Amino acid sequence: MELRDLQIFQSVADQGSVSSAAKELNYVQSNVTARIKQLENELKTPLFYRHKRGMTLTAEGRKMLVYVNKILQDVDELKQVFLDSETPSGILKIGTVETVSTLPTILSSYYKSYPNVDLSLQAGLTEELIREVLDHQLDGAFISGPIKHPLIEQYDVSTEKLMLVTQNKTFHIEEFTTTPLLVFNQGCGYRSKLERWLKDEGLLPKRIMEFNILETLLNSVALGLGITLVPQSAVHHLSKAGKVHCHAIPEKYGSISTVFIRRKDSYMTNSMRSFLKTIEEHHHINML
């Protein structure tokens, strides 16, 4: 069993097919197929179900993937320990929810200070970003917090006011039962706050419409499709233009914190250490 066998196995598991894995790894398909078969023979168990749509992991394959992910992560960290220089460099894979108002400032400041670091950004919802940090797919992520998890450490970024956004100037709480609720998909911190508020009020929304792009969601509110709850900074431009109107909500639900998370047990590169320092500096400025 060689390291590249584990890399091939991981790629096929992630991609769901030999052809996609071969393309990702720049291997010929026959080599990928042969390596997977050799691995199964060596372990004396099938690791994949083969079907017309591709390949999916068996129960033993899922067990194998847990070990493979850990081994390959350890190998990457081992390389990083010896390659990590005093000057931050390399790639930082960072996830973020869409509405972190301080993100452009943080990224700009970091890039100016450490131009040798390549920042790879990926947008997502809080729950999926947490999962990807835990799975070592991301080095860290900006999410709605705070959270509690034994494998995660978090750093304060900002706290923002949440506003109910409507097309009309006035709003009455009973409108939740007559007007569609426009929200991000499950796993969004703003949606969780709004649903908690409605539950406490004993209100059942008329209809829930899910979005995955902030701009589309807000433009839909501006056109009168429904109402939503987002950070004030995210809707400031539309509110200023008079296209939508913002309404305060009870203090208990009216704010949300953004935190930056990373795995506690992941190797702290100089690039990540510098990134955390930049976050801390901007958080301190915002608190003044």
From Swiss-Prot:
DNA-binding region, residue intervals: 18-37
Domain HTH lysR-type, residue spans: 1-58
Gene3D superfamilies associated with the record: 3.40.190.290, Winged helix-like DNA-binding domain superfamily/Winged helix DNA-binding domain
CDD domains, alphabetized: PBP2_YofA_SoxR_like
Keywords per UniProt: DNA-binding, Transcription, Transcription regulation
Family from the record: Belongs to the LysR transcriptional regulatory family.
Protein's name in the database: HTH-type transcriptional regulator CzcR
Native organism: Bacillus anthracis
Source taxonomy: Bacteria, Bacillati, Bacillota, Bacilli, Bacillales
